[in-house]
Amino acid sequence: MIRIFKTENGLIHQKDELSPGSWIALTNPTATEILEIANTYGIDPDDLRAPLDEEERSRIETEDNYTLILVDIPSIEERNDKDWYVTIPMGIITTEEVIITVCLEETPVLGAFMDGRVRDFHTYMKTRFILQVLYKNASLFLQYLRIIDKKSGVIEEKLHKSTKNRELIELLELEKSLVYFTTSLRSNEVVLEKLMRNEKIKKYPEDTDL
């Protein structure tokens, strides 16, 4: 799915046509949609497909006419009527004209921007948008970590009163989520450090508070 957003008079609007200063949000895009965006903005289709591969690692790559930023974001996976916490890739691509996000699924990381719930957000301020997305992502990780911590405490209490395997399996699953999150946060930190050193990403004094 392709959705186009643009800030006008301080408000976010969904648009029907591509134009400079827009944010193009690709969610589980089809092969046709990938080729359309790739051809329009001179992007290697493989770079648009990369965030759709769950095995992709966080990284930043700079090409002649665009920069690809890949980070891990937290996601909730439902199994056996329970919520489990995993990570999936999300791509941010900046060109001279637009900013593009690519993800396998809808994510709260981007939902707040689409709904106009983020202050001082402008689709044409690409560097600020990237930093705001990374901040929102880090906040979501922390939110889920608090939930995992609370769930772990409840299960540990049950384990003291029970010897059932079910509680032990749940605790091991939560421990696995913590490992995923820790690894992803470290990788994202490296990407952020490289991003701040990247000469192709313009830096503005007003973004230092982010």
What are these regions (language model features)?
Residues 1-209:
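Peripheral, non-transmembrane regulatory/ligand-interaction domains of membrane transport proteins
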